[in-house]
Amino acid sequence: MPRSRINGNFIDKTFSIVANILLRIIPTTSGEKEAFTYYRDGMSAQSEGNYAEALQNYYEATRPEIDPYDRSYILYNIGLIHTSNGEHTKALEYYFRALERNPFLPQAFNNMAVICHYRGEQAILQGDSEIAEAWSDQAAEYWKQAIALTPGNYIEAHNWLKITRRFE
């Protein structure tokens, strides 16, 4: 049974109803409909914390989805799940892939910066200041890109860049 029929959350139900109506009235190919159905089910599973199910749906959504913009959001969401699961290398890979298709995803740059910052903090705890500095520099570059795309957002990152003298 499609996830949209079993979800009990009011907002998810409303989203599913609206999405189903739009799929019926907007001219789309069968591949686009299939991709969207998997994407919608992935979002629903992800919102409930069912990450394995969400990943399965997102991977299925990538097969028929050919639009680079839509595909970027699928890849971004896969990156989010890998981040939540602590699989940072995989997460970075999917954020990169999302940005290859849509370079205007500030949230992907932000999440990549957060991972790099975390790795820098871990390197400090391990006593490796050189590696920590490299990770922090990389985090700074990603945060600068996120901020450039959405000035006024990512205030904490902006402050961190100023405090660490990495903001130009």
Swiss-Prot record:
Keywords assigned: Chloroplast, Membrane, Photosynthesis, Plastid, Repeat, Thylakoid, TPR repeat
Keyword Membrane: yes
Gene Ontology BP terms: photosynthesis
Disulfide bonds: none
Protein's cellular compartments: Plastid, Chloroplast thylakoid membrane
Membrane topology reported for the UniProt record: Peripheral membrane protein
Repeat (TPR) residue spans along the chain: 35-68, 72-105, 120-153
Keyword match Lipid metabolism: no
Any one GO cellular component localisation term in the record: chloroplast thylakoid membrane
Chief place of localization: plastid
Family under the similarity heading: Belongs to the Ycf3 family.
Known role: Essential for the assembly of the photosystem I (PSI) complex. May act as a chaperone-like factor to guide the assembly of the PSI subunits.
This protein's name: Photosystem I assembly protein Ycf3
Protein's organism: Lemna minor (Common duckweed)
Source lineage: Eukaryota, Viridiplantae, Streptophyta, Embryophyta, Tracheophyta
Gene that produces this protein: ycf3
